[in-house]
Regions:
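Short catalytic/metal-binding and nucleic-acid-binding patches
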Residues: 1-203
Length: 203
């Protein structure tokens, strides 16, 4: 992995993007979304994993995360990707499960694994997380806004907090919960929240 893509601060805030290989729309199916979310919940409970903001889109995940000592963020992310990839493949390879795209998905994931030094038969996640260390309140706020507005820009919802698979409901405090609890950064008030509370004239 390139040095520029390494997580330097294992316990600080990092913004990361985790795309599915080939940008395949894997997460249009609830079963694959639940694999990701269940694994996150496990990491939160057992591996010191803190998810401060996130959105789960059809073909990628954006998140701001940190890790409590003695755990290391890069190791938790590695294990999370391995586990979710393994569970996804198990589901795809079990022909008793309903999946109309089974052959197509397995073909694509095997194709993208060809010639890779990791010597995998299938590759589901792109290997890099593209971490960006967050060092100021302004940058943190910008990234939270970007994450939460993803579903709005894609046309899936009108308001960020209406996207179930994100932390926006926690920040908006308008709904009981999103899909996975978020460790809210209490000092940060996202710009989009002001926008929807005050209206465009407040900008």
């Amino acid at each position: 992995m390139s040095v520029r893509y390494k997580i330097r601060d294992q316990h600080g805030l990092n913004y990361m993007t985790c795309p599915i290989t080939g940008w395949v729309d894997l997460f249009t199916r609830q079963v694959y979304r639940e694999i990701v979310l269940d694994s996150w919940r496990y990491c939160q409970q057992h591996k010191g994993f803190q998810v401060h903001a996130y959105t789960l889109m059809p073909n990628h995940v954006h998140l701001i995360a940190s890790c409590q000592p003695p755990f290391r963020l890069e190791e938790v992310m590695r294990d999370w990707k391995r586990h979710t990839a393994r569970q996804t493949l198990l589901y795809l390879q079990d022909k008793t499960n309903i999946e109309s795209r089974r052959d197509w998905l397995l073909y694509l994931f095997s194709y993208f694994a060809l010639g890779k030094k990791h010597k995998q038969t299938y590759q589901i996640w792109q290997h890099d997380n593209h971490p960006i260390e967050l060092y100021s309140e302004q940058v943190i706020s910008q990234k939270i806004d970007y994450i939460h507005l993803n579903a709005v820009r894609a046309g899936f919802v009108d308001k960020p907090e209406d996207w179930k698979y994100s932390s926006a409901p926690f920040y908006a405090a308008t709904k009981e919960s999103g899909a996975v609890p978020a460790d809210i950064l209490l000092d940060i008030v996202p710009i989009w929240q002001w926008f929807y509370e005050e209206g465009p004239g407040s900008w």
